[in-house]
Amino acid sequence: MDIDLDRARALRVLGRGAMGTVFLVADGSRPDRYALKVFDKRSATVKPDADRRARWEMSVLSRLAHPHLPSLLGFTETDDLLAWAVPYCSGGDLNELRYSLPDRVFSPAAIRFYVAEVVSAVAELHAAGVVYRDLKPENVLLRADGHVVLTDFDLSRLLHHRPTSSAASSPSPPPPAAYRAHHHHHHNRRERVPARSDSAIAGRPPQHWSSAAPSPRQKLQNLVRFLMGSDGGAGGMAKKTKSARVSPVSRKPGSFESSGGGAWGKSYSFVGTEEYVAPEMVRGEGHGFAVDWWAVGVLVHEMAFGRTPFKGANRKETFRNVLHRELEFPGDSRRRMPELTDLIERLLDRDQRTRLGNAGGADEVRAHPFFSGVAWEMLTEVSRPPYIPPPADEGLVVDGEAFDVRDHFRNLHGQPTPTTKATGSDASSSSDFSSEF
């Protein structure tokens, strides 16, 4: 679907980041509100790779059809703006939810529920040849029904080799999902490591992503490919807001290589959120899909114990801990939660060759005893979420509160705006917050 900016009325700003601004939008042509990500091309002078990253994210989104992954609803492009729409999620994210809990930790049962859905989403990405590289609680969003959706794919990368595991857990089409631009708590802001270019990748989607039938989705994908240009892919990426570039001595030239012996393609770029970065990425020895399973291990640890396992006083110390500090659990956690702690230990194996999920992919992770009893084929059908978000405010927007997203950017650049504005009529008003996405 093409986004008509003449009809799209922004209700509020959901987030701001290195790639642009996210708006909650009501559109008379659609019954549901959606999130509109808008990249201002005029900012490319200070963020030269943000445009390519934005187009890469659109390319990935256009190929997703899974209950725990967002889909591209549509996009539009003007001389100054590139905008794309995704379903809106009103339930916040796992980081917000954890901080709302009395002890700021999840129960093993809640961890099992949420992480099973995350594993399902990661499995789908890996089956499509995409390594995510940005898993963290802030990027695990809650739909209105309490199920989760991953977000932010600008740091993802296409690898040449697919994992051997089967695809994701649910073959059913995605239910009406919601999207919400995530934001960070000021007291728990995490920094992303800026991307380093993989200069040799062509970046084209794998063949199995293509469909012979010219469906509406395929037509949308063709348009995205046209926007991406002949090379596709994300190429080199600019750093995220408040991120500092880190270049370990062992860094190798950016490239994709097949490491032989049945191994998957490797990337030598250096991206992610520092507390979630895998050791092979810090060492610069090349990484593949296994970095996502390491991140799942960090996620489980943070959900269970309220902190990531290797966080240091600064980035240098954090990376040193990732490489060398022994994994520890508080108190008698190993006795009380043997399956949970064993899952974490196997996911946080510093040797990516023996890490859980590396050899057998998602099937190996799903077979771990911690997930015993999980109905993988029916996650959204038979599992009741531990937390159901309260209904979103559906109050009417009063005259003058809805606005044209183009006016937002005209004002930023000191340009005159039209004197007459249409107003929205079917969404709530709320104060803005800032974030990186």
Predicted features by range, described:
Residues 10-18, 22:
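Protein kinase glycine-rich loop
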Residues 19-43:
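Glycine-rich ATP phosphate-binding loop
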Residues 74-75:
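A short, aromatic-enriched beta-strand patch in the conserved N-lobe beta-sheet
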Residues 167-250, 358-437:
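C-terminal regulatory tails of eukaryotic serine/threonine kinases
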